[in-house]
Amino acid sequence: MGLDPLTGTLLILARPGDIDGDTGREAIAARLTAIAGVPVEVRTWSEMDANLAVEGGGRVVGSDAEEARRFVCTSGFVVTDGTLSALTTAAHCPDTLNFIDHDGTAIPLTLLGAWGAHRQDVQIHAVPMPLAAAFQSDVEDRARAVTSWRNRASTRVGDIVCHRGQRTGYSCALVRFVDFAPAGDLCAGPCPATWVAVDGPKCRGGDSGGPVFLGNVAFGLVKGDSTSRGTCALYYYMSIDYLPPGWTLSYTR
């Protein structure tokens, strides 16, 4: 569910199996319009909204105790508590992770905390080395410095943002919603309408936790996606201002 501020229309995303074709969609839209008092549009999107699966080749690698197979996510931004610098990724990634360097070296990370409920999907890891306030963006072998950030209240529908994922690389697209509520119990229960959704165009398992940015400005961390017929319809991210208390983005002044 999301609100289009350009038209004032409330957009409801329904799974195809939950409604009876075009007739059912129009009937539901009319009923909800009468209840809400604003225009409502019902669209069929994907059969499932999901946290991006942690799989495929990537930079942050780990496994859960219950499963033997390896999972892969994408590292996000460097954060600090005022004393320690640490690395972020998504909370739904494994707790035990290794950072994979350019030469293939596995660097063990130490979990400092994970926040995976409601409006948050982030975990923070200590790294046994100094960390620069930088991230991979369009060029894999050259880091980009972080110089500022954009919070959710300052993000607008139609803004351009970019993201980098270990499975899909670098891509940019328009913000579709700034108050998106993913379907299902992906937020340790129903998700609040605090997620920012972007029009793809690329998202796959393994992109979870990756940085969302524009130039040197940090926007957030990738949480999940909504796909249609195997195509990335949109992905959504946690805004950087929802980092846990005591932690802030590291940036170059």
Question: At which residue positions do the language-model features occur?
Answer:
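Short glycine/threonine-rich beta-strand-turn micro-motifs
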Residues: 1-25
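A generic structural motif
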Residues: 10-13, 87-89, 121-127, 193-200
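Short amphipathic alpha-helices in soluble, non-transmembrane regions
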Residues: 23-36
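Soluble, acidic/polar mature domains that operate outside membranes
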Residues: 35-53
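Short, low-order "capping/linker" segments at domain edges
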Residues: 49-71
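Serine endopeptidase catalytic core focused on the charge-relay Asp
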Residues: 66-184, 213-215, 223, 249
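Short solvent-exposed strand/turn elements
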Residues: 93-96, 186-206
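Catalytic nucleophile loop of clan PA
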Residues: 201-221
